[in-house]
Amino acid sequence: KRLEAMSFSLLDLFALERTAPQLVTVQAQALARAVAESMGYVMSQSGVELRLSVEPGSFPGEPNLLKTLLYNLLDNARKASQSRSSVELLGCTTPQGYLFQVTDHGRGIPQEALDRITEPFYMVDKSRSRKEHGAGLGLALCDKIAKLHGTELTFVSTMGLGTEVSFELEY
């Protein structure tokens, strides 16, 4: 199962290298609801509550890529969280566009790892990643999707308190 997931992630990365996304107008709340629905089962199995606070708004983007981006960020947040905790997906308009932020209250990421976490195959906690069938490709894929949308992932993390990952999609 781990090898299969890694193969699909590698194929996704290669495909993103070769094609430009077809941008359409994306509705933030519809995107967030779709991702939340697809996350429902894994969140409940982990005992982690997904909290949404997403303002109305729209922006240019490729919906399937943005779903993949948010799904992977939320799944990483879930994996870092304890049972009976929560993960938040926030979305709000800004003067420049639309900001998404995923917040967990998990272990946090060591400061020395923050510069490397979007590198393919890099894993902060290898034992947890193997248990969760991770291959170290999820954040590399997220980083690539963000860059294709003209933005970057911003990580703020405190050990023992959790992590916030945000990105802003410009109008």
Annotate each predicted stretch with a short phrase.
Residues 104:
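Acidic ATP/Mg2+-coordinating residue in the GHKL
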Residues 84-96:
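Short beta-strand/loop element within the Bergerat-fold HATPase_c
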Residues 150-151:
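Conserved glycine-rich
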Residues 42-51:
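Short conserved segments within the C-terminal catalytic ATPase subdomain
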Residues 17-22, 54, 58-61:
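Conserved micro-motifs of the catalytic ATP-binding
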Residues 77-78:
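Short helix-loop "hinge" at the ATP-lid/N-box region of the Bergerat-fold HATPase_c
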Residues 109-121:
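Short conserved segment of the HATPase_c
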